[in-house]
């Protein structure tokens, strides 16, 4: 499965869809080679609590961004995130790697009344909702890239996330 996923992620149509901001899940449904891909789910036991860790890939302002979103056993509450990038601007979009940005995802939820809401970034320090975090000042495009990346990948995992344990 790992090789199949790596091959699928190198698909030029998928790469273009990510750059164009198209939903990854739509691209996967339309591409027979991608439709059969099983996306990895890592399971961790942290202090006796199960955490589900999902990899994510996307596009920032200047290139690829990627990361992991970890969910509590309820598959709704974010335990934590980790993001990185290839070439975002230092002091701006590159701040996605900093604790001040990543910590604000903890405790956020991705569902509302059984509907996947993912997490949105808000400009100007106005993030107050259960599904919102503050964007990086001066790094709006990269912040929006992280939002899109998380949303696209959570859609790919939606069936798994809705499964009851």
Task: Specify the residue positions occupied by each region the protein language model found.
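Flexible, solvent-exposed loop/hinge segments and secondary-structure transition points
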Residues: 1-165
């Amino acid at each position: 499965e790992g090789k199949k996923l790596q091959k699928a992620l190198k698909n030029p149509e998928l790469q273009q869809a990510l750059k164009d901001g198209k939903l990854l899940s739509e691209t996967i449904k339309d591409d027979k080679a991608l439709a059969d891909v099983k996306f990895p789910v890592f399971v961790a036991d942290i202090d006796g609590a199960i955490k589900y860790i999902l990899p994510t890939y996307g596009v920032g302002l200047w290139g690829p961004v990627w990361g992991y979103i970890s969910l509590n056993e309820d598959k709704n509450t974010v335990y934590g995130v980790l993001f990185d990038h290839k070439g975002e601007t230092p002091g701006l979009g590159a701040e996605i790697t900093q604790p001040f940005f990543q910590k604000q995802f903890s405790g956020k939820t991705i569902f509302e009344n059984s509907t996947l809401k993912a997490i949105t970034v808000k400009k100007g320090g106005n993030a107050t909702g259960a599904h919102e975090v503050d964007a990086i000042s001066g790094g709006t495009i990269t912040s929006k890239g992280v939002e899109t990346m998380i949303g696209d990948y959570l859609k790919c995992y939606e069936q798994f996330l809705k499964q009851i344990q």
